[in-house]
Amino acid sequence: MFRIGQGYDVHQLVEGRPLILGGVDIPHDKGLLGHSDADALLHAITDALLGAAALGDIGRHFPDTAAEFKGADSRALLREAAARVRAAGWRPVNVDSTLIAQRPKLAPHIDAMRANIAADLGLDVGAVNVKGKTNEKLGYLGRCEAIEAQAVCLLAQA
């Protein structure tokens, strides 16, 4: 048996924060605002995994009201979510994701993101895809006010 999950996240870009996407620290004049490290890509993937296993969402497992998750490393949250998915009888098969950001250019960092995600999920890097897109200068994404992430994953019964 297989299950598909879909995840989404968006965070505002602000000065004075690091920009971390896919567990990679990306040089930029702004970073993402959030309770944790605000890694929108890993949050979307975490939601996709939890959703596919019918385990709710990232906010249910790692609430932004909990002090223990203040400044949390989203890679640690992804690994914990994957452990909970496995405990529920499922295993990740693949992940496909999209980052939407007008700036910075993400292509130079995609391979490192894929490697981090694959390592955290126990997958071959060939089972993880990350695409970078712009919003063609339209809307809040096009004005560089935020970065958005979308993800889908496939789980197989363990």
UniProtKB/Swiss-Prot annotation:
Where is 4-CDP-2-C-methyl-D-erythritol 2-phosphate annotated to bind? 9-11, 35-36, 57-59, 143
* Protein's UniProt keywords contain NAD: no
Molecular-function annotations in GO: 2-C-methyl-D-erythritol 2,4-cyclodiphosphate synthase activity; metal ion binding
Lineage, top-rank taxon, reads Bacteria
Q: Name one Pfam family in it.
A: YgbB
- What EC number(s) is this enzyme filed under? 4.6.1.12
PROSITE patterns on file: ISPF
Which pathway does UniProt place it in? Isoprenoid biosynthesis; isopentenyl diphosphate biosynthesis via DXP pathway; isopentenyl diphosphate from 1-deoxy-D-xylulose 5-phosphate: step 4/6
Instruction: Name a single GO biological process.
Output: isopentenyl diphosphate biosynthetic process, methylerythritol 4-phosphate pathway
State where a divalent metal cation binds.
Answer: 9, 11, 43
Q: What NCBIfam families does this protein's entry cite?
A: ispF
Q: PANTHER family from the xrefs?
A: 2-C-METHYL-D-ERYTHRITOL 2,4-CYCLODIPHOSPHATE SYNTHASE, CHLOROPLASTIC
Q: Which family does it belong to?
A: Belongs to the IspF family.
Function in brief: Involved in the biosynthesis of isopentenyl diphosphate (IPP) and dimethylallyl diphosphate (DMAPP), two major building blocks of isoprenoid compounds. Catalyzes the conversion of 4-diphosphocytidyl-2-C-methyl-D-erythritol 2-phosphate (CDP-ME2P) to 2-C-methyl-D-erythritol 2,4-cyclodiphosphate (ME-CPP) with a corresponding release of cytidine 5-monophosphate (CMP).
- HAMAP family of this UniProt entry? IspF
> Mind telling me what this protein is named?
2-C-methyl-D-erythritol 2,4-cyclodiphosphate synthase
The species is Chromobacterium violaceum (strain ATCC 12472 / DSM 30191 / JCM 1249 / CCUG 213 / NBRC 12614 / NCIMB 9131 / NCTC 9757 / MK)
